[in-house]
């Protein structure tokens, strides 16, 4: 890891240092994904079967995982694993239950009632990657808010064979449909539907470059599906002072670096001593990792930054806007009001990022690659939609009419104006009729 003294860098050098590597999808990936999507759209289940055999080397008897298979997977799982997953489920559920919005109803002026109501997205799709290790934590992070939000149908796709842990969590989250489909073909199947796979309104979940590109393409097609957020490499930034434990910091940096060679890890500290100690601790701990080669590649583009104060550390962090932000200082909560841009913040020596990744209760699906400036961590709101309601009485419209008419005239929208005045004229005539009856 490079050690840099912040004050020794020019403004342009500081900007360059904190720039992330460009994410580029080759034309070959774009073309390949377009071909996969078209195959699924045109051939449905048959196309999915063919693509699964081509890319996964598997010919499943059925695309859909049966309830019997899910129960069998649950039976095979150890009690230790079930207990861990249930504890994580409980904590994540508690945090997301607390996010339920309250209805809004306001009388903005006499006779004018405005409301905001929240409804679940009708159908959602969850993509869970395959790979060398199962990711039941991702099922929890996606399945629980979908369940609490009340989405009417939840579809899960994962490359075959689907791990027992994933199927068990799908059962915990009461996911409606589980399919043996991976890659871009899974995204296409959920976005457009097939004979077996239900079309969904929004797709959630991480994946490789092909999955990411497929999500981008279907989200740009009005016939496709919305997606959760832009994707990017995993990253962590640690703010630490002289009170921090360098071994803890090193472990936190490495826990992010082992995700992949494109992961970004950054330490910002006012203490040169801590920077040196962390560099030594990283090297020691690296040798103990099964994914040492991957972590070492990530560390090659990562940074140790020595700032002149904690205030400057905060400024650097806010400019960078990390996915994960760990604050290991003497009084970490004092810095919290100063922190503007981060996906998830971990305060204090005993709040490792791993806790949030798995079981503290917060969601581990987070904006990365600088998107923390405009995107938030995944939550209940992402599985919901807001609708506004307004109801005006006759007197309410009378009171509001002059404002609406004046603004419609200013914008040259005669029909907008007429929609109000025709009602006011009708009300005036009714008033005249009432007066005549009463005379």
Swiss-Prot record:
Asked if the Swiss-Prot or TrEMBL record annotates the protein with the keyword Metal-binding, the reply is yes
InterPro entries from the entry?
Ald_DH/histidinol_DH (IPR016161), Histidinol_DH_CS (IPR001692), Histidinol_DH_monofunct (IPR022695), Hstdl_DH (IPR012131)
Q: Which UniProt keywords apply?
A: Amino-acid biosynthesis, Histidine biosynthesis, Metal-binding, NAD, Oxidoreductase, Zinc
Query: What are the required cofactors?
Result: Zn(2+)
One of this protein's Pfam families, by short name?
A: Histidinol_dh
Q: Which family does it belong to?
A: Belongs to the histidinol dehydrogenase family.
Q: What is this protein called?
A: Histidinol dehydrogenase
Q: Which organism is it from?
A: Aliivibrio fischeri (strain ATCC 700601 / ES114)
Report the gene name: hisD
